[in-house]
Amino acid sequence: MIKLFDPFVGKKEEKILIQTLRGHLWASGAGTNAVYDFEQKFKKYVNSKECVAVNSGTAALNLALSVIDLKNKEVIVPSLTFISTVNAIKLNQGIPVFCEVEPDTGCISVENIKKKISKKTCAVLPVHFGGLSCDLKQISEICKNHKLSLIEDAAHAAGASFNGKKIGRHGDFVCFSFHPVKNLAMPTGGLISINNSDYKKLKKELYAKRWCGITDRKGISYDVKELGNNYYMNEFSAVIGLKQLEKLDGMNKKRKKIAKIYDQEINLEAKIPFENDCSYHLYWILVKNRSRFIKKMMREKIEVGVHYKPVHQMSLYKNNQVKLPVTETIGERIVSIPIHPNLTNSNIEKIIKSVNEFAE
């Protein structure tokens, strides 16, 4: 079976895992040792003001939104995303306002953002879909003009760039996800990159909230001033993350090489565009008869996936009664095909041949 996702790991990850296991310091709510090192190195990598490591991309979104007053306020967000993006708004008592995406990229539509802004809007939450960056220049201008917070969902975008700057350098908060299926793989992990002018204060607040609200820690003494969660990253994830970060650009270069071949040789117009700045977490195509296509691909032992069923069509959010024709069409037809660095030349050839034969 050619896997849809497959982490690119080697002896360096194996060696550091054994060292960490034998070191007996596996986790610390205070975020010391490898967790702190990972924060510092990722901060340097994206050139942000600060970084706070957490235990998942979902935790990153929940935590970032918790330091913004969202109660009964609106957050503009695409529906073409993983459920966590929107749930984080709802969990923080905000109101998700679903926005249309661009048909050729799957990224949030700038023109539709403008139409969705109301007196209740307090933030915009774009998703760098598949690793292709949204138009952060225009979105940042909109947020600045309307005094809105910009929180980016960069779960797919580790290593991606926009206008020569790494994703992680632009928004007030940029939320990353690190998981075995992601470009930077960990058992589980996440991170918030902070660029807001109050970054020092926000980092301190996020540090407390990721460890059950614990603050003012001095020796055995500490205080709790507000609610928090058990969101801190463990040492195993951090040490793997450090090794993965060293080779992230190289792994993404392999993804781009595969993407360029797909772009040239897959005979479909409806597919993710080729962009040098894209991290290609996903390579998506649109097919007319998805269920039949998936069955045929699986018969050829090629694993494929669907990213995603639009969130506004989920039972939890159906009361919004919003119509998003572009999102809904993509949601009915989208299929992700393998694009990870472990693919061999023969794997790539087989995938292209099968897609061209089975897609309509």
Where on the chain are the PLM-derived regions?
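Short secondary-structure boundary/capping segments
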Residues: 6-8, 88, 165-167, 182-183, ...
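Hydrophobic "lid"/C-terminal helical patch
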Residues: 21, 64, 351, 355
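Phosphate-binding glycine-rich loop
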Residues: 28-74, 80, 88-92, 98-100, ...
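PLP-dependent aminotransferase class I/II
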Residues: 36-40, 45-51, 58, 111, ...
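PLP-dependent aminotransferase-like
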Residues: 67-145, 149-154, 161
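Conserved active-site segment immediately N-terminal to the catalytic lysine
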Residues: 152-186, 220-224
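Short beta-strand-to-turn element immediately C-terminal to the catalytic PLP-Schiff-base lysine
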Residues: 176-177, 190-196, 242
